[in-house]
Regions:
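Short juxtamembrane loops and helix-capping segments at transmembrane helix boundaries
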Residues: 107-134
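Mechanotransmission and gating elements of multispan inner-membrane complexes involved in transport
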Residues: 1-36
């Protein structure tokens, strides 16, 4: 029987016998590597997106100095200005998250179709659950708020007299 010889190594063997379990283990290893690479890319994308939001919000604070001064002159508190800019940066994060989900889902569907065309059947199937979508949107909002915290703090600390005197 062949099973009796499965663990024996043959010198100068020109072939390899793999069981379905071996193939599944190799495939799982490949998927784990791909998953790690995708997580790395996602982390870099989040960092770059956060820096982009921070830059956008700093620019927004600079361009809206006079508006901030008027708001504070008519009674807006520091916390009001901080919340305004924090929510705005959170919404920028949500917009970026939505674009990312649309592009990611589109790419996953394309890979699914390409694998179906190349292999004749579907081995990979793209699926976006409502829970994952909601979690991604919430996480995007949080990343946006964190990225916009320093510009929002700067906006909140502006003095009305100084901002209205400028320009």
């Amino acid at each position: 029987r062949l099973a009796d010889y499965k663990d024996e190594e043959i010198e100068d063997a020109s072939f390899v016998i793999e069981t379905p379990e071996d193939m599944l283990e190799n495939f799982q290893t490949i998927l784990d590597v791909v998953k790690a690479v995708l997580i790395g890319i996602a982390a870099i994308s989040l960092f770059v997106g956060g820096v982009g939001i921070m830059n956008t919000m700093y620019t927004s604070v600079l361009e809206r100095n006079k508006e901030i001064g008027i708001m504070k002159a008519i009674g807006a508190r520091n916390v009001d200005v901080f919340l305004l800019f924090s929510i705005e940066s959170g919404l920028l994060g949500v917009a970026g998250g939505l674009i990312g989900i649309l592009l990611g889902t589109g790419l996953a569907k394309a890979v699914e179709e390409i694998s179906r065309a190349a292999l004749g059947q579907t081995f990979l199937q793209a699926y976006l659950s409502p829970g994952l979508f909601a979690g991604a949107m919430a996480f995007s909002f949080i990343v946006g708020v964190i990225a916009g915290a320093l510009p929002a703090l700067k906006a909140a600390k502006l003095q009305p007299a100084d901002t209205l005197r400028e320009e």
